[in-house]
UniProtKB/Swiss-Prot annotation:
GO terms for molecular function: structural constituent of ribosome. One of its GO terms (cellular component) is cytosolic large ribosomal subunit. GO terms for biological process: translation. InterPro entries: Ribosomal_protein_uL29, Ribosomal_uL29, Ribosomal_uL29_sf. It comes from Nitrosococcus oceani (strain ATCC 19707 / BCRC 17464 / JCM 30415 / NCIMB 11848 / C-107). Keywords: Ribonucleoprotein, Ribosomal protein. Pfam families: Ribosomal_L29 (PF00831). The lineage of its organism: Bacteria, Pseudomonadati, Pseudomonadota, Gammaproteobacteria, Chromatiales. Belongs to the universal ribosomal protein uL29 family. CDD domains: Ribosomal_L29_HIP. This is Large ribosomal subunit protein uL29.
Amino acid sequence: MMKVQELRTKTEDELRKELLELSRERFKLRMQMGTGQLVRNSELKRVRRSIARVKTVLTEKQQQAQ
């Protein structure tokens, strides 16, 4: 899990990459949950919140650029 401070030091491209990776991870976890293979449900929550953090920082950067 990355802290918001660490995310703010990254560029927009790096944040987009991170968002893509987290989205893929979320998809895998959702598939595991559907097939009953997911052991720790908290992983899904962690990834979902990380996605929200990245999106928040991306929005902040876009608003600063304007």
